[in-house]
């Protein structure tokens, strides 16, 4: 809907994954009817990828992209804006100036993706594990498994972006490597976290495995990356004032139905099992709470309600 508002919904390609143990949802029909200008492609799992979802759910992204790029090899010649489905674009979104070169432009995620992030995790190692950890170089180990080096990550330290990407010269083989790489990174980091840190949350953010795999595979094929302000984004947990300065709102950063443990928030994780958010009284609590109104999360929730009412959607 937000792409339609800024005149780009005719370029939208939506890839939808159906696990091998589930039938394709009929609920998508009403969305497809609403946006005939967009392309919707359904992929039923025929490669037992569903068995990997217990390890890492985001693996379905490179899997679907691998299949789509195989079916559409000329996509390699296009600049492709790649993002999650929980994104809202604002009137300030404009990356037209960055489409016609070979540079891959990224949102700024340096703080939790870069080489510096890896090195700083030393500070969170359990005291009794410090000496053993000193014998390891986790960044070096992981980058070698993908096919690059620590040095490449260090050279590109300030352009270690992710979350939203404007990709160039990308093909099926690229997504196959990303698919394989994100499982390697996820499992390796989980092992490291169990060995050297108090818990998973204190260790490396292994849920970012696909972001590292995309980034490092760009460098593997000698691609250039640049973090640019035009792709800066607001988190759902950010103050609403930040939305005025960014072109993208990513509904991430909320981990519970209570933001900061106190005021109500729209938490997408509460609805993964099929609960209808529009029949959940909590949604109105979010909409009407004066504190929640100070955050981007409130804007995201109001946009959901607006679209539902505008098109009389059923969940």
Q: Where are these predicted regions, by residue range?
A:
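GT-A fold catalytic core of metal-dependent nucleotide-sugar glycosyltransferases
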Residues: 59-120
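Short amphipathic alpha-helical segments embedded in low-complexity Lys/Glu-rich regions
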Residues: 16-21, 82-84, 231-236
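Short catalytic/ligand-binding loop motif for oxyanion handling, primarily in non-cytosolic enzymes
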Residues: 23-24, 50-51, 88-92, 97, ...
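Surface cap/lid and interfacial helix-loop subdomains adjacent to catalytic sites
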Residues: 68, 106-153, 158-162
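N-terminal anchoring/stem segment of glycosyltransferases
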Residues: 1-57, 68-77
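C-terminal catalytic/acceptor-binding lobe
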Residues: 201, 205-206, 225-226, 230-315
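Catalytic core and acceptor-binding pocket of nucleotide-sugar-dependent glycosyltransferases
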Residues: 136-252
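Phosphate/oxyanion-binding active-site loops and adjacent basic polyanion-contact surfaces
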Residues: 1, 53-62, 174, 206-210
């Amino acid at each position: 809907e937000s792409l339609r508002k800024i005149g780009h919904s005719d370029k939208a390609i939506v890839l939808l994954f159906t696990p091998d143990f589930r039938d394709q949802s009929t609920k998508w029909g009403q969305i497809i009817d609403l946006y005939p200008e967009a392309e919707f492609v359904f992929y039923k799992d025929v490669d037992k990828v569903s068995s990997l979802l217990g390890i890492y759910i985001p693996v379905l992204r490179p899997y679907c992209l691998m299949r789509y790029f195989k079916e559409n090899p000329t996509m390699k010649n296009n600049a492709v804006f790649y993002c999650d489905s929980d994104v809202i674009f604002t009137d300030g979104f404009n990356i037209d100036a960055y489409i016609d070169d070979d540079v891959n432009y990224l949102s700024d995620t340096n703080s939790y993706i870069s080489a510096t992030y890896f090195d700083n995790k030393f500070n969170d190692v359990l005291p009794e594990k410090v000496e053993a950890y000193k014998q390891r170089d986790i960044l070096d180990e992981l980058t070698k498994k993908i096919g690059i080096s620590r040095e490449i990550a260090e050279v590109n330290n300030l352009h270690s972006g992710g979350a939203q990407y404007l990709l160039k010269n990308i093909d099926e083989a690229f997504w196959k490597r990303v698919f394989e790489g994100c499982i390697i990174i996820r499992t390796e980091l989980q092992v490291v976290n169990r060995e050297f840190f108090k818990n998973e949350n204190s260790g490396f953010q292994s849920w970012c495995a696909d972001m590292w795999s995309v980034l490092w595979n760009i460098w593997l094929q000698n691609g250039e990356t640049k973090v640019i302000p035009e792709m800066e984004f607001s988190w759902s947990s950010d103050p609403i004032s930040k939305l005025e300065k960014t072109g993208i709102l990513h509904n991430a950063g909320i981990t519970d139905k209570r933001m900061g443990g106190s005021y109500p928030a729209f938490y997408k994780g509460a609805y993964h099992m099929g609960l209808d958010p529009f029949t959940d009284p909590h949604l109105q609590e979010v909409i009407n709470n004066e504190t929640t109104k100070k955050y981007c999360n409130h804007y995201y929730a109001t946009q959901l309600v607006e679209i539902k009412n505008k098109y009389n959607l059923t969940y």
